[in-house]
């Protein structure tokens, strides 16, 4: 059996979209599941779109996602170089071989020439059958040229796709595509065929947008007498629009790149776990997987033909599940940079607050909004003191707050246990239920009905002076 070798071949043009991450992930997982190799290859043939530092960004993204190439730039391997701009001479050699075999030709048309809006609809093949003496004269005169693939004018080209089955295209619809540009650089459609063959790629896993190009690739394999690899074209990742419809995932749907999601506070492992299930179904009902577990069970048979819809709420769920597996210490250390503007007292007691937040946030990016009241206390409406469940009204709150404040003023050791003991003693002697007492205290301390932790935690984290000042403010608002 042929050794499984897959590749991820991005263009260095910017951030890594979720769809590209999924392509890399599936290639990696399929290789690992079959004890094969996963290659990283940089397709930088379009120098006009090249973004500085993009290659490092791609490598860093893969590293953060725990996708480790076996071969590629910076990873070693016997099939290098793994950057297409460094393989220029290789492509020219094979293009000239096609010319000699009659499967390609030099096109001397200038920019805009040789194209027609009717008939064929693309390049009209002006140079396809130029006499050799005309070609020689143009070459001698130094006229610039591109090299085009000579497509068959009749018949059909069929290829098998593991996801979509047999796909057939009429050859008459195929334009004589450019293989080598005037600057000597190959086009994507040519370079990737040469590289996939020379690097012994067994399975090409890529987006469905390349289905229309694949017949041209298959013909190139036939022209060279090479066995084509297996093709796996993945359906797109979609986003849900406001009207309920779906369209290809883009920035209007929210964050769409791996780096953006990480900046929002999603864990890389949660992102890759969720992205793996966007179009692939494992045989069990299990959803949370480690990379190692997915690398053991991933199969192409589990891939769907239908587009997957990116669901941010589902990603929140995955991230929450991963938070649960973290130790309180690890969560505290990782979450502190997302805390925003916090007081020194909160910072000093961050492990305590972080432990409360761990089960209350779906991602780190939600933390600042849940705790901003500690450092930035905003005014609130006294209507918040109403709570039917706990039988609290603003009038009732006006009775409770002064009494509770008096009790707290007598707490000399402002520790969690001392505060807790004092409040419980007050509740017991008052004859009121705990919720009845705690509700007005929570509102006066936080200015909001929902907080991480209970009233005792709020009192401790605010500190005695600030806590009593906020309760006094509540008393005055209710007067």
Predicted segment positions?
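N-terminal Rossmann-like or analogous alpha/beta NTP/dinucleotide-binding catalytic cores
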Residues: 1-118, 213-226, 270
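Residue-level signal for inorganic ion chemistry
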Residues: 27, 58, 98, 102, ...
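Glycine-rich phosphate/pyrophosphate-binding loops
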Residues: 32-44, 190-203, 224-238, 451-457, ...
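Conserved phosphate-binding loops in nucleotide/dinucleotide-binding enzymes
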Residues: 81-85, 180-181, 199-210, 238-274, ...
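Active-site cores that bind ATP or allylic diphosphates and position pyrophosphate for catalysis
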Residues: 97, 105-249, 257, 282
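Residue-level detector of well-ordered alpha-helical segments, enriched
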Residues: 270, 314, 331, 349-356, ...
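Small-residue-rich helix-loop
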Residues: 328-430
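Charged substrate- and nucleic-acid-binding regions of tRNA-handling and nucleotidyl-transfer enzymes
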Residues: 416-478
